Swiss-Prot record:
Expressed in vanadocytes. Interacts with VIP1. It comes from Ascidia sydneiensis samea. The keyword Cytoplasm applies. Residues 1-20 form the signal peptide. It comes from the Eukaryota. This is Vanadium-binding protein 2. Changing H89A: Loss of Co(2+) and Zn(2+) binding and reduced Cu(2+) binding.
Amino acid sequence: MSKVIFALVLVVVLVACINATYVEFEEAYAPVDCKGQCTTPCEPLTACKEKCAESCETSADKKTCRRNCKKADCEPQDKVCDACRMKCHKACRAANCASECPKHEHKSDTCRACMKTNCK
């Protein structure tokens, strides 16, 4: 009876160890979420775009109205948001895709595939 209990305890311990290792592995290789990391700097831009959409609801040409509104009102926030995302993507590229993305080949298919997988 004690051998059966010992075997069950051993199995439970092994399963717990395997699960902990899997969780650590999954967290270590999770893609970098640049959009999520830049939520705070991009909040004013999102609010500005929503404001433009609301103000252009009564316009006859909504598409042109929104484009002009975004260009006139949202451009400063857009630069801050773009700078945050660019910084995040550069850091992610250097950390995860250095061999696939040499200095001047950021548009190659292998580089894009690596960036898509690792830097969302």
